[in-house]
């Protein structure tokens, strides 16, 4: 995929909202795209990912996830953005996958799983309508 259409050359980063909007075309089911670049959104220096539930589309950026824990970090961020696509917000539990990762250490400390509260929200929304 050509990432240049999302790239802000002055920053050397891909703009997250532009990527989501462009990739959302034709999406009918919740979809998370993994992009091999560094992402940002106005007001933030960087993002690990961004979801737009109304568009059923999210992106996860790999640049800052690299290192020996890359696969684990990537999995956590994909699950996190998927949680947003299914209606979850950020969680205050630092071990929950829905906890907002402000740093890579935050991502490393949290698990790849939803906490009990977030699981209940998902079950209530999708299993007990």
Positions of the model-derived regions?
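Metzincin-family zinc-dependent endopeptidase catalytic domain
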Residues: 1-78, 85, 89
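Generic, low-specificity signal for short hydrophobic/alpha-helical stretches with a mild N-terminal bias
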Residues: 42, 80, 97-100
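Metalloprotease/metallohydrolase-associated module, dominated by Zn2+-dependent proteases
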Residues: 47-73, 88-129
